[in-house]
A protein has these predicted regions:
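Oxidoreductase and adenylate-handling cofactor-binding alpha/beta cores
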Residues: 100-116, 159, 293-301, 306
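Glycine-rich NAD(P)-binding loop of Rossmann-like domains
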Residues: 118-151
Length: 318
């Protein structure tokens, strides 16, 4: 009986599929490409390449799933991964370029007040110049210094901020890019020194409501929060009054509930840019190509009995 690789990635090009088929042939696998709209997903794959946890729910033969996403919250609680029957890997390292550019865009849109100018343009109203802020001379803190945080910090450095601070779990300073690194349990030390807070941390038990009412209050008046990590990292109920009062501003690509419900008060909140979780995805060709390349690299590793390069520890959350 042949071994099967199931691919559930709707955004692949014919060139991507050709590469996957060639790798499968080389390693003795047959390939089945499926669309996520199918009611009955294949349950006989030894390997699954997809960001959907649906494949793992009734897959007795599954031994490894490679997710196209960097975050893995959707796989928590699935027995096949929790009991060690199957390995799980992600596509961390593929999203740095696209999300870094997205974060720079979100940051500049808020500092340059493009939300207000765009709203005025929709009303056909010609606004007078508004007071703006700059990354130049600002103290910028990155909550998360992995691929996304690191790539963004490299770009932000070019704007000549007063300081670049990093917050991560282990206190490491990648390539000594940051002026100072804080561990997660030291975050309250850096928040009062932060003019712009850029969040790209994964969603874990440790980061749930990491920015609660107490910690939001530590940020200086006029600080900007930019979040592409996970929505629940910020306590939205605590953030709302800070935005409404005009003390803080925020640009959010992720939310505690997605899609954001129509009756959520954030929709009508001032000092806020709302984006519908579009920072990542596979919409940039470079991202898609890197995701496929990383999968093929680990596909060869798996077939040769070597460790996966991007294996996930579900208990840690990344």
């Amino acid at each position: 009986m042949s071994r099967k690789l199931v691919v559930g990635v709707p955004d692949l090009t014919e060139g991507d599929k050709k590469q996957i088929i060639e790798a499968a042939d080389r390693n003795g696998f047959e390939v089945e490409f499926c669309t996520m709209q199918e009611e009955a997903l294949p349950a006989d794959g030894e390997i699954v390449f997809s960001g959907s946890p649906a494949f793992a729910k009734n897959a007795e033969k599954l031994r490894w799933q490679c997710s196209v996403s960097a975050g893995v919250n959707q796989f928590k609680g699935l027995p096949v991964f929790e009991n060690g029957t199957a390995l799980l890997s992600n596509s961390s390292g593929a999203y740095g370029v696209t999300i870094a550019e997205h974060l720079v865009m979100m940051t500049l849109e808020m500092l340059r007040r493009q939300v207000e100018f765009a709203a005025a343009a929709a009303r056909k109203e010609w606004l007078k110049p508004l007071p703006v802020k700059s990354v130049y001379g600002s103290r910028v803190t990155f909550a998360g210094t992995g691929d996304i945080g690191f790539e963004t910090a490299k770009r932000i450095r070019a704007f000549e901020p007063a300081a670049l601070y990093g917050v991560n779990r282990k206190g490491r300073n990648p390539e000594n890019l940051f002026d100072r690194i804080y561990t997660q349990d030291q975050i309250e030390e850096v928040l009062p020194q932060t003019d712009i807070l850029i969040i790209s941390m994964p969603g874990t038990e440790e980061t749930f409501h990491m920015l609660d009412e107490k910690r939001l209050a530590l940020l200086p008046d006029g600080a900007l929060i930019v979040n592409v990590g996970r929505g629940f990292i910020i306590d939205e109920a605590a953030l709302l009054p800070e935005l409404t009062a005009g003390r803080l501003a925020a640009a959010l690509d992720v939310f505690e509930t997605e899609p954001l419900p129509a009756d959520n008060p954030l929709w009508d909140c001032p000092n806020l840019l709302i984006l519908p979780h579009v920072a990542g995805n596979m919409t940039l060709p470079h991202t898609r190509e890197k995701i496929v390349a990383q999968f093929l690299e680990d596909f060869d590793n798996y077939c040769a009995g070597r460790p996966l390069l991007r294996q996930v520890d579900l208990k840690a959350g990344y």
